[in-house]
Amino acid sequence: MYQPISTEFPVYHRTSSFSSLMPCLTDTWGDLPLKVDDSEDMVIYGLLSDALTTGWTPFNLTSTEIKAEPREEIEPATSPVPSVAPPAETTTAQAVVPKGRHYRGVRQRPWGKFAAEIRDPAKNGARVWLGTYETAEEAALAYDKAAYRMRGSKALLNFPHRIGLNEPEPVRLTVKRRSPEPASSSISPASENSLPKRRRKAVAAKQAELEVQSRSNVMQVGCQMEQFPVGEQLLVS
């Protein structure tokens, strides 16, 4: 059966324990607004009084330190900025001189021309010079023709597709040799002074010998002319 709950609270009256409890509470929490004439305050007082009778006091509470949690600073979310790639440097700024194609049997001379050579198996692999050409392609073609004549279809060629085209032979570069200047028999006095002492003596002796020979030749011609009588004709057969 339903029993009505009594809403009447026990009435506590002020006793001597109130005066002993109040200093204990006020030392911990300060002045409490408990009024003797207020029924609700007396209810609170009664609860505190019962707690004191069981041996509880406010001083038994252990103060626990509350450790402040570290505050994490949250950075505002920012949209990633797209990285802009630096402009590509022009190839002309860093242009590297490309090396020419290397052909089989071709070597470049220090002065820029190209020489063609081939190893002759009949001469124990000795190098045979084929000539000097203006371009590397011409030198490579000259090597191909010589290699095909030596080894036939087994030859390793630079331009195998051109070997059967019957192209003319590449033009070789001819080196013009300077002809030696004829040594002059007469030497100027200035040049004689620049020659060493022994050299000057040899030159003087040579000149004297030439002069003696020329004089002897003149004398021989004069003697031969005197042998012919005056007025007679010389018949040449």
From Swiss-Prot:
Explain the induction of this protein. Answer: Induced by ethylene.
Tissue specificity? Weakly expressed in roots.
Which residue intervals are the DNA-binding region? 102-160
A GO molecular function annotation here is: DNA-binding transcription factor activity
Its biological purpose is as follows: Transcription factor that binds to the GCC-box pathogenesis-related promoter element. Involved in the regulation of gene expression by stress factors and by components of stress signal transduction pathways. Probably acts as a transcriptional activator.
The family line of this record is:
Belongs to the ethylene-response factor family. Class 1 subfamily.
Q: What is this protein called?
A: Ethylene-responsive transcription factor 2
State the species of origin. Answer: Nicotiana sylvestris
